């Protein structure tokens, strides 16, 4: 399911953790490779390789975590999400440019 993810991803990201995301979620449309680490769940070794790489390269993991934190707080904060709900419920049109696809929710 495109863009499906547990809300834990946003919680970890918002708390400054380096997140590892299955490529099948297609969250690459929302977060770049500089903001999250993507792995291929079809390749049983890929996740382990990436975990080991970032354990050995902590500064790189910290850089990605910082970038993800900044993106999360800039593009997906409580004010923007609340504004989005109000746009759908009341305005029936976007009042700002959102960082996620919106066309299926507006007439």
Task: Give, region by region, the residue ranges found by the protein language model.
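Short, flexible active-site loop motifs that bind/organize anionic cofactors or intermediates
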Residues: 2, 36-37, 51, 71
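Conserved acidic donor-binding segment of nucleotide-sugar-dependent glycosyltransferases
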Residues: 6, 37-43, 54-58
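Nucleotide-sugar-dependent
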Residues: 1-10, 20-24, 28-29
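C-terminal amphipathic helix plus adjacent low-complexity
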Residues: 45-107
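An acidic- and aromatic-residue-enriched active-site/binding cleft used to recognize and process polar
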Residues: 24, 41-42, 77-78
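A short alpha->beta transition loop at the rim of the catalytic pocket in nucleotide-sugar-dependent
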Residues: 15-17
């Amino acid at each position: 399911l495109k863009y499906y993810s547990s809300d834990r991803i946003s919680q970890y990201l918002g708390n400054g953790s380096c997140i590892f995301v299955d490529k099948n979620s297609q969250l690459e449309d929302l977060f770049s490779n500089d903001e999250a680490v993507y792995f291929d769940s079809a390749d049983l070794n890929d996740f382990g390789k990436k975990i080991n790489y970032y354990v050995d390269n902590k500064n790189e993991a910290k850089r990605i975590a910082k970038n993800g934190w900044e993106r999360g707080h800039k593009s997906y904060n409580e004010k923007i999400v609340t504004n989005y709900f109000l746009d759908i419920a009341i305005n029936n049109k976007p009042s700002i440019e959102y960082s996620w696809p919106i066309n299926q929710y507006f007439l």
